[in-house]
Amino acid sequence: MRHTARLTIAHLFVPFLLLIFMPIPVRGSDAKGNYVALGFGSEACQTFLQARSNGLDLPYRHWVTGYLTAVNKLTKDTVDMRGTTDIDGMLLSLAQYCIKHPLHTFSRAVEALIKALYPKRVTAMPQ
């Protein structure tokens, strides 16, 4: 009986500890929605536009795809935030945003893109 009780406690306690210390995906920002954007996300939109006009937007493409991968992983009921929009379409949308808001950060432009893409996102893997 005593051995069974210990096993039962161990079977309940270990998963409980794992659950407590397991990272839980949530939106990471402060109460005002501020967060630190790293890499090209911290650049001004006007810097992106200049790079794009010179054919040097490849690092921004990579940054956007990495950001979208994280969004896909952390957004409930989302498999692919892009929906049917390809990377060139996304970069065109980002350029249009940045023309209107040249002093905004590139990450802020990408956030606006995500909001626009959200209704058209893929919510389940195709069968």
Q: What residue spans do the PLM features occupy?
A:
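C-terminal partner/receptor-binding element of secreted or periplasmic proteins
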Residues: P102-Q127
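Short N-proximal segments of mature Sec-exported proteins
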Residues: G33-Q96
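N-terminal secretory signal peptides that target proteins for export/translocation
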Residues: M1-L7
